[in-house]
């Protein structure tokens, strides 16, 4: 049977964010650090968080149910559901299997969970696109769910937490179309961030090394993308980053996104060594080897200065979500996409090309691209992002710590009833009601 495989991409999108946050400026004062350490140094304003009433299952159920409702999806016409997450509740049972309770009598649904730090969501998306392009496709659409709850022990990393979950409707004839064959990937073994202790929600993090890995993987993935882009489309004139009208990045912090966009120039400089825009960093580019360039602050500062105006126009709109929510791990890059759709008018986005970089520690990374071919005004409207973020509850740092303590008390427990209030949850949010003596979890929906 022949199916229409034209313009494969994103047809619908929902981003779920918790309905409470803590101000990063308040955390600075509470933690006794210098003013601006989190807000300026990391580029963060607010951090979303949850207590023991929400987990990755409830996140997925909430995001998926909202996608189905807002887009009036006939679930019998969904042939794949794939999940990306690193928030693990069970070492055997997948998050995808929990979400199947929303599919009624439709049991013929391919896909499973993808796990590798923050990269799993993009890998789930790639798998879904590849499924539609393959002989296994049966003509139905796919759904990708990506979400996490990012928590850190007390210390420098704690303000880089966050939480959120995205659900994407993927299929042909989409307004957001992925460019076929244009992906560059970089993978390597590294202990930069990992979670070997299953008795804790907290990761082991080598912070400086992880940022170095992020940049090194960006260099590799972007260079590999360029090889395929040149083979398909020929060499572009000028700097390579100017091929993209906008860019989105995985956002561990918003300051890191600004540095990452500037770093694209480092790879571009190899193809355009005499470009006059590089004059201010030409000596550094010629004297630093690749490894030293990863951590050289003078080069980083110089590249950021060159790309500042480009960043403000092409990237800044997308960091609205992570600035106000924090790091959502697998959902992070998609929160940036949601923000881009919400903050830039649909008529300005139409016809524009977007570059995208996904990174997951350990490590796995890809650079890819898509084109906004159709009208995305309805998608932007249905995300309801700005309204959701503007109407959340602002809690104190002490209340934040109390919520984290509730999660600590709930971790790995059975015969457990959550203590957190459901009062602040939005209508339609799934929440945990209890865990029985066999660790089976039960949920309800906030009316």
Curated annotation (Swiss-Prot):
EC numbers on record: 2.3.3.10
Domain of life, per lineage: Eukaryota
A GO CC term assigned to this protein in UniProt: endoplasmic reticulum
GO molecular function (one): hydroxymethylglutaryl-CoA synthase activity
Pathway: Metabolic intermediate biosynthesis; (R)-mevalonate biosynthesis; (R)-mevalonate from acetyl-CoA: step 2/3
Keywords: Lipid biosynthesis, Lipid metabolism, Phosphoprotein, Steroid biosynthesis, Steroid metabolism, Sterol biosynthesis, Sterol metabolism, Transferase
Residues that, per the record, bind (3S)-3-hydroxy-3-methylglutaryl-CoA: 118, 156, 160, 210, 250, 259, 327, 361
Enzyme class: transferase
InterPro entries: HMG_CoA_synt_AS, HMG_CoA_synt_C_dom, HMG_CoA_synth_N, HMG_CoA_synthase_euk, Thiolase-like
GO biological process, one term: ergosterol biosynthetic process
Catalytic activity from the UniProt record: acetoacetyl-CoA + acetyl-CoA + H2O = (3S)-3-hydroxy-3-methylglutaryl-CoA + CoA + H(+)
Active-site residues annotated for this sequence: 86 (proton donor/acceptor), 118 (acyl-thioester intermediate), 250 (proton donor/acceptor)
Result of knocking out the encoding gene: Impairs growth in absence of mevalonate.
SUPFAM superfamilies (UniProt xref): Thiolase-like
Modified residues annotated as Phosphothreonine in this record: 398
Gene3D superfamilies: 3.40.47.10
Keyword Phosphoprotein included in the entry's annotation: yes
Function according to Swiss-Prot or TrEMBL: Hydroxymethylglutaryl-CoA synthase; part of the first module of ergosterol biosynthesis pathway that includes the early steps of the pathway, conserved across all eukaryotes, and which results in the formation of mevalonate from acetyl-coenzyme A (acetyl-CoA). Hcs1 condenses acetyl-CoA with acetoacetyl-CoA to form hydroxymethylglutaryl-CoA (HMG-CoA). The first module starts with the action of the cytosolic acetyl-CoA acetyltransferase eg10 that catalyzes the formation of acetoacetyl-CoA.
Family: Belongs to the thiolase-like superfamily. HMG-CoA synthase family.
Full protein name: Hydroxymethylglutaryl-CoA synthase
Source species of the chain: Schizosaccharomyces pombe (strain 972 / ATCC 24843)
């Amino acid at each position: 049977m022949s199916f229409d495989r034209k313009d494969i991409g994103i047809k619908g999108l929902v981003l779920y964010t918790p309905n409470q946050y803590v101000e990063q400026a308040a955390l600075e004062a509470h933690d006794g650090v210098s003013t601006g350490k989190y807000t300026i140094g990391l580029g963060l304003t607010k951090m979303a968080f949850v207590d023991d009433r929400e987990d990755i299952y409830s996140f997925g159920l909430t995001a998926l149910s909202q996608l189905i409702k807002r887009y009036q999806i006939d679930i019998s016409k969904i042939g794949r559901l794939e999940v990306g997450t690193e928030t693990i509740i069970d070492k055997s049972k997948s998050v995808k299997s929990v979400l199947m309770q929303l599919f009624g009598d439709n049991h013929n649904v391919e896909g499973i969970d993808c796990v590798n730090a923050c990269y799993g969501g993009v890998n789930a998306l790639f798998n879904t696109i590849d499924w539609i392009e393959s002989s296994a496709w049966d003509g139905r659409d796919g759904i990708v769910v990506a979400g996490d709850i990012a928590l850190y022990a007390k210390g420098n990393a704690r303000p880089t937490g966050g939480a959120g979950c995205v659900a994407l409707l993927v299929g042909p004839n989409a307004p957001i179309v992925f460019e076929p064959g244009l992906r560059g990937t970089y993978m390597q073994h590294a202990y930069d961030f990992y979670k070997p202790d299953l008795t804790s929600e907290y990761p082991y993090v080598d912070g400086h090394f992880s940022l170095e890995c992020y940049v090194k993987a960006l260099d590799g993935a972007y260079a590999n993308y360029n090889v395929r882009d040149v083979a398909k489309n020929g060499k572009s004139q000028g700097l390579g980053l100017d091929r993209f009208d906008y860019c989105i990045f995985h956002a561990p912090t918003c300051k890191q996104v600004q540095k990452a966009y500037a770093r694209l120039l480092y790879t571009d400089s190899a193809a355009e060594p005499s470009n006059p825009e590089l004059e201010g960093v030409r000596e550094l580019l010629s004297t630093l080897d690749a490894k030293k360039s990863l951590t050289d602050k003078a080069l980083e500062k110089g590249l950021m200065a060159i790309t500042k105006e480009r960043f403000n126009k092409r990237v800044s709109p997308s960091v609205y979500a992570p600035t106000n929510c924090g790091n959502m791990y697998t959902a992070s890059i998609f929160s940036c996409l949601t923000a881009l759709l919400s903050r830039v008018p649909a008529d300005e986005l139409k016809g524009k090309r977007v570059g995208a970089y996904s990174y997951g520690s350990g490590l796995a990374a890809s650079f890819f691209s898509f084109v906004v071919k159709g009208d995305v005004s309805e998608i932007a409207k249905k995300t309801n992002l700005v309204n959701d973020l503007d109407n959340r509850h602002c809690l104190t740092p002490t209340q934040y710590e109390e919520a984290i303590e509730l999660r600590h008390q709930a971790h790995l427990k059975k015969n457990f009833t959550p203590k957190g209030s459901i009062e602040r949850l939005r209508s339609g949010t799934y929440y945990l009601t209890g865990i029985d003596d066999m660790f089976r979890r039960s949920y309800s929906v906030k009316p």
